[in-house]
């Protein structure tokens, strides 16, 4: 857990034995929601939690948890997951989702008694927005008749993708971004250089900023390609962008387009501050109406980033449309 999450932890711990059967942790990507959910799960299962409701780290329950072998805890995540929203997305073109098979396995697990007599069980589903229709409906049936002494923790950065009936079955906890000072202080502990610029690029999300810092060369290569405007080669550039995953690639494009729009209106750059000369040149040839339409297309593309259609084909098409923004009508 992180310092900026103490208020949410206190809110949950005040409920004590009266915790609801399901909590929905909602907030921006890269702010530590998954880490918070893991810490909360560990504390709830701990035999000797501290006065601050943190796991002791030494009891048998904590030992099981540290070994990813706790019999009363289940983590439900996509097949290709790597610590959900707080870790880099794997470089894959496979559809990223939580399958119905995983929920069926969960149903079988919940039919058994807890390992410890009358003990609580914790089910962590992260990120919940990648439940497909079948798995979402199967989970809904569980939430409608939840088993006793079982807490469901759902983590999401895109709550609008969840079916409304699942949301209504959960108590929503809004997870905050840290203050700028707290985020910078944490990044300094991670020895991130140029922390202020990286944090700005990550829109104030410190864990995402750390990831961007670690991917620095890839991000620089991507933005240099975008600076080419109409001269960008979509087919040569698409594999480079996919190196950070489809969702991150689209996010990079969105930030570039946002800066193009703000530069057109007010000569201001919010994310790509090192590319003033490039934006000066691009703004002279870009078509603003096409730019705004393309921005909407990127929003829709991000919603379907998990589509089974080849991500490379999708991205080639998006980059081709990008080059056409700079051509005369």
Q: Where are the language model's segments positioned?
A:
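Clamp-loader machinery-focused feature within the broader ASCE/P-loop NTPase space
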Residues: 1-134
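Charged, glycine-rich active-site and insertion segments that engage polyanionic ligands
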Residues: 1-43, 51, 60, 148-151, ...
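Short, structurally constrained coil/turn elements
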Residues: 67-69, 146, 166
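Conserved adenine-binding aromatic site and its adjacent loop/helix in ATP-hydrolyzing domains
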Residues: 108, 141, 164, 168
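Conserved catalytic/switch belt of AAA+ P-loop NTPases
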Residues: 111, 137-151
């Amino acid at each position: 857990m992180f310092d900026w999450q103490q208020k949410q932890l206190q809110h949950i711990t005040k409920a004590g034995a009266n915790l609801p059967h399901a909590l929905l942790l909602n907030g921006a990507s890269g702010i530590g929601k998954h880490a918070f959910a893991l810490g909360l799960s560990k504390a709830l299962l701990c035999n000797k939690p501290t006065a601050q409701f943190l796991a002791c780290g030494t009891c048998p329950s904590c030992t099981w948890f540290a070994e990813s072998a706790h019999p009363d805890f289940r983590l439900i995540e996509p097949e290709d997951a790597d610590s959900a929203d707080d870790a880099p997305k794997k470089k894959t073109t496979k559809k990223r989702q939580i399958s119905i098979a995983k929920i069926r396995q969960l149903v079988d697990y919940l039919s058994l008694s807890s390992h410890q007599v009358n003990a609580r069980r914790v089910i962590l589903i992260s990120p919940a927005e990648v439940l497909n229709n079948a798995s979402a409906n199967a989970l809904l049936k569980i939430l409608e008749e939840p088993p006793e002494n079982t807490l469901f923790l759902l983590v999401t950065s895109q709550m609008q993708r969840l079916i409304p009936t699942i949301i209504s079955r959960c108590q929503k906890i809004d997870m905050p971004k840290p203050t700028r000072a707290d985020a910078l202080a944490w990044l300094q502990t991670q020895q991130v250089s140029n922390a202020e610029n990286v944090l700005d690029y990550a829109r104030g999300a410190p864990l995402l900023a750390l990831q961007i810092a670690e991917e620095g060369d890839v991000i620089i290569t991507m933005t240099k390609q975008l600076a080419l405007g109409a001269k960008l080669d979509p087919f040569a550039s698409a594999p480079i962008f996919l190196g950070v995953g489809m969702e991150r690639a689209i996010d990079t494009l969105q930030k570039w387009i946002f800066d193009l729009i703000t530069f057109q209106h007010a000569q201001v750059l919010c994310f790509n501050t090192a590319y003033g000369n490039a934006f000066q040149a691009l703004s002279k040839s870009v078509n603003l109406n096409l730019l705004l339409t393309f921005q909407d297309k990127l929003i829709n593309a991000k919603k379907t980033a998990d589509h089974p259609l080849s991500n490379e084909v999708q991205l080639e098409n998006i980059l081709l449309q990008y080059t056409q923004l700079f051509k005369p009508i």
